[in-house]
Curated annotation (Swiss-Prot):
GO terms for biological process: acetate metabolic process; acetyl-CoA biosynthetic process. Disulfide bonds: none annotated. It catalyses: acetate + ATP = acetyl phosphate + ADP. InterPro entries: Ac/propionate_kinase (IPR004372), Aliphatic_acid_kin_short-chain (IPR000890), Aliphatic_acid_kinase_CS (IPR023865), ATPase_NBD (IPR043129). This is Acetate kinase.
Amino acid sequence: MAKILAVNAGSSTLKWKLFDMPAEVQLAEGLVDRLGQPQSKVKIKYGDGQKYESDTPIANYQEAVASLMGNIKALGLVEHLHEITGVGHRVVAGGETFAESVVVDDATLLQIQNLRDYAPLHNPVEADYIDVFKKMMPWATEVAVFDTAFHQTMQPENFLYSIPYDYYKKYGARKYGAHGTSVRYVSARAAEMLNKPLEDLRMIVMHLGSGSSVTAVQGGQSIDTSMGFTPLAGVTMGTRSGDIDPSLVAYLMKKLDVPDVGQMIHILNNDSGLLGISGISNDMRDLEADEDTKPRAKLALDIFVNRVVKYVGSYAALMDGVDVLVFTAGIGENGDEIRDKIMRSLDYLGAKIDNDINYKSHGVEADLSTPDSTVKTLLVPTNEELMIVRDVMALS
């Protein structure tokens, strides 16, 4: 038996889950929050619903990892830290360099750092954390699992932008997508639920959360996805605009007197989407509560549904039909009203859901389809961390 950590690191947070493998039993999950602030927060759930919380200053990545390791031992999750034989790291951008998960050596770490332009807010932080784990747990196998890797099966007609081809060859300007680890997990799990080979299915995965994407999966491979060079593209999201005309960026910069493109991208990433349209919130639950009394709340919801439906329709056309629709992630797993609204517009595909089941299903696996539906509609809670530790086991 081996114990494997799955790590999701950000500039001010460190999220982790500890698994007993190969049994795939989750032993604990934790969060280090507000890193670098006077009162950082540590939260851990373990055992049979037990919780541990503390407020303590954690200044840097080294202290965050030391806190994680110390708490894992203090809570009796391991007797010796050497029981943890592997650590899997979520890495946002792998570019064309990485089409699958890899064991991290010094050369790999440098490659991840060199991809920082593809995800400047994420890759440098993730590379730094990998380096810290390598130094503090030198006995463990460190594995990088890339959000973009699953989408490396896309063909050029789906991943290239219609800009000068040299920009792709020289600068890597193309669609990379995101949420690949999530889509890989839920598509495989959906096939298992249906007791059918994944390779025989045409599937559309709707990963709907604060960040949302739609992915066409055919024969077990990603053939197209809504997110683009970065996760800013695609459907409307919580605070992200999704697809817009690039000329609008220059137009708004002039009108708003925004001096640099980075500031404009910040607006599109942080002040747009559901929040920007509604002027109320980026939280779907808040908008649903207000949709009958506040027109812009309803408008934001309508736009969100509209964009998802458009992508689903285009991907059904791309695959010459669809066998399975899958809802996952925070909104997809818990947003019964949003699922209902989306599915009302997909009846033409032969996809029908039983709303008695739909409105009772939250965060659990469920077949939402009616008996006469020719397209299956499934709710599959995502589990990126389990996918990550499986990759660690496979590479250890």
